[in-house]
Design a protein with these regions (language model features):
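Conserved pre-ATP/AMP-binding loop-to-beta segment of ANL
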Residues: 13-14, 117-134, 141, 146, ...
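Conserved AMP-binding/adenylate-forming core of the ANL superfamily
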Residues: 14-46, 55, 61, 88-91, ...
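Conserved AMP-binding A3 loop
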Residues: 26-28, 130-157
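Gly/Ser/Thr-rich phosphate-binding loop
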Residues: 222-227, 233-300
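AMP-binding/adenylate-forming catalytic core of the ANL superfamily
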Residues: 326, 352-439, 456
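Conserved AMP-binding/adenylation subdomain of ANL enzymes
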Residues: 153-170, 178-224, 238
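Conserved ATP/PPi-binding loop(s) of AMP-dependent carboxylate-activating enzymes
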Residues: 305-312, 316-344, 376-378
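Conserved AMP-binding/adenylate-forming
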Residues: 23, 40-85, 377
């Protein structure tokens, strides 16, 4: 296995590699366009094996894939940036890793091979970082997780052992490429030399584009699909007979917990759902349900099992918390900080869980305040920082509340500055400039004074308990989840 579009072009030149915006490309044709982009980056000073990352706005366009594969060939670390990030969010990530250049594919010219310069291509060591992927941190800003080529290749090999590949397999990419879940769909497809079909959601996000998503599954004969449970739930409602029309072999569910009801509904409709558990730091997967999936969900206390660890991955439970070790682990956080691994090489996830030798791993929730909404990780402290920068906000506590569709929604309890009244419209106009929409609160309440501890710190537990009866939904438009 390799993550080289050139190697794929040699091994399967005429096989379809990419379907994007109506364009169909073989591995050979795609490799030619990637090579044509080399002169462009060379003129901008990007050199092979350059340790400085290249920031790429991952808009899902054909040009974006060309830059993506070119970074893989050059051994230049990739910083994937979500198109919906605000300017301050984008600037922070670029500064944090010292990215040398930001590419916006939507502003690029088509790739044309205007010269026949015989470029020298490096042999890229597997230890080299392939991507720096944003993940929620505890400082009010995302952490950047360094993932090596070795980690992505280890995941591709383990995935092929869990779900044996077929020559006819076609994978649909509908997850954001700024997340490791989306990026790993691309790397697994490239490593397996299979076609990746890129689906671009409309302005209402993936949840608002479910009918089009279902049609793509059918039209493109998709066999492999990765989703968050919220999207699967809507797919079941909109297209209950999907299994009769699309040749789906495996639907990998991740990003949030899958309910027993959703699993049962999917299996009743003959959809091959594989629950999974993973983190950005584990290259998206730690464990996955056995393939083919059972008809009934393996349950413990109403929680659906996420199966057994992937090949080469070790999982242990210490004091009720999940720890992970294996070749898919990240190399560390950009900028260092606390050592992420213990003396035995285990990464402490902070997630509560239990391992059953017959039923597999069960994940019971996080030991932190992280909110996971529709598969998106939201750090409450980041949202609180943004709120405190808004006029009239004295204090804020952000937390997650249960939501039947998204798993959780972001909620906030506010304390206003003296003499100020809440202007909801003005508040969210300010938040629109600071936070992506999925990070913004969907429910709120206002306290005269938020409960505090004797030290003066906010008493987050009391705030949550007292806010429960006071929260009201925020009247905003339909949420674009992804």
């Amino acid at each position: 296995m390799s993550l080289s579009i050139f190697a794929a072009a040699r091994e399967a030149p005429h096989a379809e590699a990419l379907v994007c915006d109506g364009e169909r490309s073989t591995f050979s044709a795609l490799a030619e366009r990637v090579q044509a982009r080399r002169a462009e980056l060379d003129a901008l000073g990007v050199q092979p094996l350059d340790p400085r990352p290249l920031a790429l706005i991952v808009d899902g366009s054909p040009a974006m894939f060309e830059y993506l594969y070119l970074c893989f060939e050059l051994g230049v670390p990739l910083l994937p940036l979500h198109p919906r990030l605000t300017a301050p969010e984008r600037a922070y990530l670029i500064r944090a890793c010292g990215a040398q250049l930001t590419i916006e594919p939507s502003q690029s010219e088509p790739a044309v091979n205007r010269d026949a310069k015989p470029w020298a291509w490096p042999k890229v060591p597997e230890s080299r970082p392939l991507a720096l992927v944003p993940s929620s941190g505890s400082t009010g800003h995302p952490k950047l997780v360094e993932l090596s080529r070795r980690a992505f290749l280890a995941l591709a090999r383990a995935d092929a052992q869990r779900v044996p590949p077929r020559v006819s397999d076609r994978a649909l990419l509908c997850l954001p490429l700024s997340h490791v879940g989306g990026l790993s769909v691309v790397t697994r497809s490239l490593a397996a030399r299979r076609c990746c079909v890129a689906f671009r959601a409309g302005s209402t996000g993936l949840l608002g584009s479910v009918p089009e998503l279902a049609q793509s599954l059918i039209d493109e004969r998709i066999s492999l699909l990765s989703l968050v449970p919220a999207v699967l739930a809507r797919l079941l409602r909109k297209t209950p007979a999907l299994a009769a029309h699309a040749p789906l072999r495996a639907i990998l569910l991740g990003g949030q917990a899958c309910s027993a009801e959703l699993f049962a509904a999917a299996r009743e409709r003959s959809l091959p759902v594989l629950t999974s558990y993973g983190l950005t730091e584990t290259c998206s997967q730690v464990s996955t349900l056995a393939f083919p999936p059972p008809l009934a969900a393996p349950l413990k206390n109403g929680v659906v099992s996420v199966g057994f660890p992937l090949e080469g991955v070790d999982v242990r439970i210490v004091n009720g918390l999940i720890q992970v070790r294996g070749p898919t682990l990240f190399s560390g956080y950009v900028g260092g900080g606390d050592a992420p691994f213990d003396a035995q090489g285990f990464f402490h996830t902070g997630d509560r869980g239990e391992f059953d030798p017959e039923l597999g791993l069960f994940v019971f929730g996080r030991n932190s305040e992280l909110v996971i909404t529709g598969g998106e990780n939201v750090d409450p402290s980041e949202v609180e920082h943004a709120l405190l920068a808004c006029a009239g906000i004295e204090a804020a506590v952000v937390f997650g509340i249960p939501d039947p569709e998204f798993g959780e929604q972001v909620a906030v309890a506010l304390e206003l500055s003296a003499g100020r009244a809440l202007d909801e419209r003005a508040l969210f106009e300010q938040l629109d400039q600071r936070l992506a929409s999925f990070k913004q609160p969907r429910a709120l309440c206002v306290f005269d004074a938020l409960p505090r501890l004797g030290s003066g710190k906010l008493d987050r537990a009391r705030v949550r308990a007292q806010a429960a009866a006071q929260l009201r939904p925020i009247a905003r438009g339909p949420r674009a989840s992804r």
